[in-house]
From Swiss-Prot:
GO cellular component, one term: cytosolic large ribosomal subunit
Record lineage: Bacteria, Bacillati, Cyanobacteriota, Cyanophyceae, Synechococcales
PANTHER family in alphabetical order: LARGE RIBOSOMAL SUBUNIT PROTEIN BL19M (PTHR15680:SF9), RIBOSOMAL PROTEIN L19 (PTHR15680)
Keywords recorded for this protein, A-Z: Ribonucleoprotein, Ribosomal protein
Annotated NCBIfam families: rplS_bact (TIGR01024)
Role description: This protein is located at the 30S-50S ribosomal subunit interface and may play a role in the structure and function of the aminoacyl-tRNA binding site.
Keyword Oxidoreductase recorded: no
Protein's name according to its UniProt entry: Large ribosomal subunit protein bL19
Highest taxon, organism lineage: Bacteria
HAMAP family with a match to the protein in the record: Ribosomal_bL19
Length: 154
């Protein structure tokens, strides 16, 4: 008897086990809220994997040099940006620092995500001695008044 093209019965043992495995995976799909938390755990695990481990301890008031990756055409270079850390925000993967510097007499502030691929490296040039968590008052100061005392114990 010739094989009928409309015949859909399959007697291969491997395909039978594959079909039963598909049925089992469909049955074990997450339906309860407890199993949906595993997705959050998966995201958190991915974020911790992406975090940089070679970052120095950065405090508000420190003078830092941030190496910023800049791509011009098909070339990529690292441009240093040096200034005083005036604020730190968030934590973990989304941690940011705001760095302020004076360029040609004008105050320039940039916010850097510490774990971003655009940040090539960070080096602490000097430690600052401050008594505030945010140094926004430096925005109104001019000249020597913007200097932060140096801290030697860290």
């Amino acid at each position: 008897m010739a094989a009928d093209p409309k015949d859909t019965t399959v007697t291969d043992e491997n395909t039978e086990t594959a079909a039963t495995a598909e049925v089992e995976t469909v049955a074990s799909a997450p339906t309860s809220p407890a199993q949906k938390l595993s997705a959050e755990a998966l995201i958190k695990a991915f974020e911790t994997e992406q975090m940089k481990s070679d970052l120095p301890e950065i405090y508000v008031g420190d003078t830092v040099r941030v190496g910023v990756r800049i791509s011009e055409g098909n070339k990529e270079r690292v441009q240093p940006y040096e200034g005083v850390v005036i604020s730190k925000r968030h934590g973990g993967m989304n941690q940011t620092i705001t760095v302020r510097r004076i360029f040609q007499g004008i105050g320039v502030e940039r916010v850097f995500m510490l774990h971003s691929p655009q940040v090539a490296n960070i080096k602490v040039e000097r430690r600052g001695k401050v008594r505030r968590a945010k140094l926004f008052y430096l925005r109104e100061r001019v000249g020597k008044a913007t200097r932060v005392k140096q801290r030697f114990d860290r």
